[in-house]
């Protein structure tokens, strides 16, 4: 079954819009949705997942604050999820403009959102873990190649039991909450 853990509107915007990339000397540019597919072996038992470039604001922010050679943002969507989103696009169900359906103006995207389960109701049916991380590649102090993966893994059963929220929502919300607490405390 296809049931995004986030709003289908957000899912479509992030996954089907041309992803923004940044490279030193080239600046910002876009590429094709689902480009640069790679299988990434996620930690803590999650394992290998197909990851692709998606549109996300970090690609705008990071090069403004950090001296980087390349910045990209990827989601580990998996082959079935990617295929489903490509099919939604191929059928025109990602369109915002309305079409006439028996005298009623309907946005295909709104119809899709109405037909899919409400992501807010999915938490108790979701299983497994989610991982958010940053892979940084470069050179160490001796000039040797080094890669560091900083990440956070959340188990859906844990987030549901402790917070009543599914893991993807919890993981999205926790960083701004921590930032607000730090700012509040000075």
Residue ranges and their predicted role:
Residues 1-186:
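C-terminal catalytic/substrate-binding lobe primarily of soluble NAD(P)-dependent oxidoreductases
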């Amino acid at each position: 079954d296809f049931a995004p853990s986030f709003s289908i509107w957000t899912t479509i915007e992030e996954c089907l819009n041309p992803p923004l990339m940044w490279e030193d000397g080239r600046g910002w540019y876009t590429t094709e949705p689902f480009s640069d597919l790679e299988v990434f072996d996620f930690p803590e038992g999650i394992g290998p997942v197909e990851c692709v470039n998606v549109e996300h604001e970090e690609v705008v922010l990071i090069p403004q604050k950090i001296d980087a050679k390349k910045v990209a943002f990827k989601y580990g969507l998996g082959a079935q999820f990617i295929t489903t989103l490509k099919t939604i696009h191929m059928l025109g169900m990602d369109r915002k403009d309305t079409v006439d359906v028996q005298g009623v103006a309907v946005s295909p995207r709104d119809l899709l959102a109405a037909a899919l389960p409400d992501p807010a109701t999915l938490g108790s049916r979701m299983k497994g873990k989610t991982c958010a991380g940053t892979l940084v590649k470069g050179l160490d102090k001796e000039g040797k190649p080094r890669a560091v993966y900083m990440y956070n893994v959340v188990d859906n059963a844990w987030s549901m039991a402790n917070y009543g929220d599914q893991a993807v929502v919890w993981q999205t919300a926790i960083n701004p909450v921590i930032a607000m607490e730090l700012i509040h405390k000075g």
